Amino acid sequence: MSELSQALTDCGALQFGEFTLASGAKSDYYIDIKKASTNPEVLRLIAKLMAEKMRSEGIQADRIAGVVLGSVPLATALSLETGIPYVMIRKEKKDHGTGKLIEGDLHEGDKVLVVEDVITTAGSSIKAIHTLREAGAEVSYVISVIDREGGGAENLRDVDIKFRPLVKASELVKR
């Protein structure tokens, strides 16, 4: 078992039972990644592994992007680990404040790495990628903590995104 798989198991992120996922699919296990992203030791490990993935894959980024809410701690931690600024992507505009979909400084032509907690179908990631591209950003990569292997990799490939998970669900849930 990898160091990350062990850390996710130890912090209680991996749960077994009957669950409905954000995609609507049913599952006999659930990965409560917020148990990991609110644990400083596990969050630090995730940031370190994401930074290593960036280096090993040669991923260059001017900005890191996290989708509100679940991916923001990951984007923050990776930003602190790498020194790369981050932006937050809202799922929908708010009717108060600035009403922006993208919070933080983003400039046309910026290379943006999207980070995600768990990818199943990649629906929310693809929406965020479209939002970033409409703002003039270049998005080529998504790094996630978990790939639930629910078609997300293929869906991301369809929008010209290279997907790099830290761990696949099939590796994590081996019992």
Mark where each language-model region is:
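PRPP-associated nucleotide enzymes
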Residues: 1-115, 119, 123-175
